[in-house]
Amino acid sequence: MSILSFLLGEKKKSAAVAKERLQLIIAHERVGGRPPADYLPALQKELVAVISKYVKISNDDIRVSLERQDDLEVLEVKIEIPQA
């Protein structure tokens, strides 16, 4: 790592930022009990914004859901990508 990149910082890729955010959300859910998943609409909106940079999609093309069974939580993301 050069001194300039250390001082100025390196720009993280959007995939790395999204991964960090999802890990924080999941960790928060585990520690804080089981509050309602009120962050799902915001997560869906942000996913649409990121994916729209590469593929033309709308809000209707993505579905985000959180299912809970006993001690297992599953965050499911379904994205319909139009054929080119």
From Swiss-Prot:
Gene: minE
Family from the record: Belongs to the MinE family.
Protein name: Cell division topological specificity factor
One of the Pfam families matching this protein, by short name: MinE
Keywords recorded for this protein, A-Z: Cell cycle, Cell division
NCBIfam families: minE (TIGR01215), PRK00296.1 (NF001422), PRK13989.1 (NF010595)
InterPro entries: MinE (IPR005527), MinE_sf (IPR036707)
Function: Prevents the cell division inhibition by proteins MinC and MinD at internal division sites while permitting inhibition at polar sites. This ensures cell division at the proper site by restricting the formation of a division septum at the midpoint of the long axis of the cell.
Listed GO biological process terms: cell division; regulation of division septum assembly
